[in-house]
């Protein structure tokens, strides 16, 4: 509640000058005397890139967390993968943005998906890479907290590993994993620098992913 109040209080100057149309207008004219501003373009771009990034990141985070916390739990390989995932979370946004600019955009152009490589898809892909470590790390913790007694009981009844994952691990870890994806989505919404570098420089609502 305090955060909502703080945001509302900080937006009062904008609301008093431009009204609520600031949220639904796609005009952006900073010319002196005109001062016609609208945030719709930024809102749409943020929602599109964040949602698409989450769609890409969830399967990657889910599979990685199962790999680390269940299939190879306690092994050196799981430790290495877990360390690499944690390192990805510490890389600055500008590094991701530069990597996307110099590596990912040319790959998109070579694939014939976009003439310049910029767009919603490229931005969402970078965002997905950025939020996977957050979702994976929290999911690892949640899966590791599932009692071993439940899993051993399922194995004793003849369940396969896939059945144990489906009937024991997922039901017990669902709430924690969902929370991890929500936090990752919040991280995607709050990211600006890497997206600004890759989304393009067109002042218009996108009609496609490229």
Residue ranges with predicted function:
Residues 2-12, 98-106, 186:
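A structural signal for multi-pass alpha-helical bundles of membrane permease subunits
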Residues 5-8, 58-66, 95-98, 122, ...:
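Membrane-embedded alpha-helices of multi-pass transport/permease systems
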Residues 7, 42, 46, 83-90, ...:
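Residue-level signal for discrete positions within transmembrane alpha-helices
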Residues 8-53, 74-78:
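Periplasmic/extracellular loop-to-transmembrane helix junction in inner-membrane transport proteins
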Residues 53-85, 106:
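Transmembrane-helix boundary motif in ABC transporter permease subunits
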Residues 86-127:
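Generic hydrophobic transmembrane alpha-helix motif, especially the helices
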Residues 138-139, 155, 161-196:
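Transmembrane alpha-helices
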Residues 188-210:
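Glycine-rich helix-loop "coupling/hinge" segments at transmembrane-helix boundaries
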